[in-house]
UniProtKB/Swiss-Prot annotation:
Lineage: superkingdom: Eukaryota
Cytoplasmic topology ranges: 1-6
Catalytic activity: 3-O-(beta-D-galactosyl-(1->3)-beta-D-galactosyl-(1->4)-beta-D-xylosyl)-L-seryl-[protein] + ATP = 3-O-(beta-D-galactosyl-(1->3)-beta-D-galactosyl-(1->4)-beta-D-2-O-phosphoxylosyl)-L-seryl-[protein] + ADP + H(+)
Name the UniProt record assigns to this protein: Glycosaminoglycan xylosylkinase
One GO cellular component term: Golgi apparatus
Tissues in which the UniProt entry reports expression: Little expression detected in the secretory stage enamel. Weak to moderate expression is observed in the gingivae and odontoblasts. Strong expression in maturation stage ameloblasts.
Length: 409
């Protein structure tokens, strides 16, 4: 081969090498991608659309028993859930046999017991779909539709750490009031021709009730986790102070993650990576209100971070609160599987998947188009943040293999 031909060939090979490196880092590094992640993504997409059907294949088990058996330390529901439609149908239609004020918290909710003894949390509609919540990123009432959308995003991301949620219409006069406790019943009132209630909570006020359209109220129901899995509450290391003029340490100390890594349960095990997964999840939905989080009790840091209470989300599609990503850009680590999944979802796939997943919900359309568009844009921002980390520290440091011992972080 002549020298000139060799030079041309080497130049071509060099261009191919450089292109391959750039392409792989931007579109899935081979060290990050694996066939199982690809198969998992395709399985998720195949089973994405959930039709609410009453029929269960397991005729000897109730939907509540099946959902309870799904729960394990690292997931609330399994990857493949052929019974999901039947369980969500039961959540949306089963007779309410008791209604009470919600469990502890700052926002209005009701605790319902459905036929068969299953507890669910009911969050009422407070805003129309196109209402924009102004102010701080954690401002406003809970958004019931945000709970529904967040659950389906949890499915799409492959986390499987959020309790099941579905939209539901309830008749306050015929379904709730006849079975309501005195404590809940005492908070009912009529505004114009609409039945309303204000419940019992830190911010609940008689002057700020949630009102039905006549007697019919739209809301979301969240499946209560089984009692055999008691929860333990933790202060989120990247929580806000909620005090004007007072910053949390992470808001001014760029080396804050180093301090977090030295404290339990973030010094070993999966919890820190769960925190970072959650930061990505919260950023996509616009949730800046995760000041605490729950895991299962007595887990020694091994159980998942459970994605509860996602209703302070999807408030303002024009607001991008980048500080939600602080765990990601301060620690500059993320699971390989999360990185892979995020890459599979770009180029409009996330918006399409989320819209498809929610299409059969009883309160569909769950989100307005501006919110769906924003989720796609926020995904690009997450990927850009990860790329900044890989540019600075290298992919081998930033992308953490899920099965790798985590004590090195």
């Amino acid at each position: 081969m002549k020298l000139k031909q060799r030079v041309v060939l080497l130049a071509i090979l060099l261009v191919i090498f450089i292109f391959t490196k750039v392409f792989l880092i931007d579109n899935l590094d081979t060290s990050a991608a694996n066939r199982e992640d690809q198969r998992a993504f395709h399985r998720m997409m195949t089973g994405l659309r959930v039709e609410l059907v009453p029929k269960l294949d397991h005729t000897l088990q109730s939907p509540w028993e099946i959902a309870a058996q799904w729960v394990v330390p690292r997931e609330v529901y399994p990857e493949e859930t052929p019974e999901l439609g039947a369980i969500m149908h039961a959540m949306a239609t089963k007779k309410i046999i008791k209604a009470d004020v919600g469990y502890k918290g700052t926002q209005l909710k009701a605790l319902l017991i459905l036929e068969g003894g299953q507890k669910v949390v009911f969050k009422p509609k407070r805003y129309s779909r196109d209402y924009v919540v102004e102010g701080e990123p954690y401002a406003g009432y809970d958004r019931h539709n945000a709970e529904v959308a967040a659950f389906h995003l949890d499915r799409i991301l492959g986390f499987r750490r959020a309790p099941l949620v579905v939209g539901r219409y309830v008749n306050l006069r015929t379904e709730v009031k006849p079975v309501a406790t005195e404590q809940l019943l005492s908070t009912f009132l009529t505004v114009g021709n609409n039945t309303c209630f204000y419940g019992k909570c830190y911010y609940c006020r008689e002057t700020e009730p949630a009102c039905a359209d006549g007697d019919m109220m739209e809301g979301s129901v969240t499946l209560w986790l089984p009692d055999v899995w008691p929860l333990q509450k933790h202060r989120h290391p990247w929580g806000r102070t909620y005090r004007e003029g007072k910053l949390a340490r992470w808001e001014y100390d760029e080396s804050y993650c180093d301090a977090v890594k030295k404290t339990s349960p973030y010094d070993s095990g999966p919890r820190l990576l769960d925190i970072i997964d959650t930061a990505v999840f919260d950023y996509l939905i616009g949730n800046a209100d995760r000041h605490h989080y729950e895991s299962f009790q007595d887990d020694e840091g091994a159980s998942m971070l459970i994605l509860l209470d996602n209703a302070k989300s999807f408030g303002n599609p024009s607001l991008d609160e980048r500080s939600i990503l602080a765990p990601l850009y301060q620690c500059c680590i993320i699971r390989v599987s999360t990185w892979n999944r995020l890459n599979y979802l770009k180029n409009g796939v996330l918006k399409s998947a989320l819209k498809s997943a929610m299409a059969h919900d009883p309160i569909s359309p769950v989100l307005s188009d501006p919110h769906l568009d924003t989720v796609d844009q926020r995904l690009l921002n997450v990927l850009a943040t990860i790329k900044q980390c890989t540019d600075q520290f290298g992919t081998d440091t930033v992308l953490v293999e899920d099965r790798m011992p985590l004590s090195h972080l």
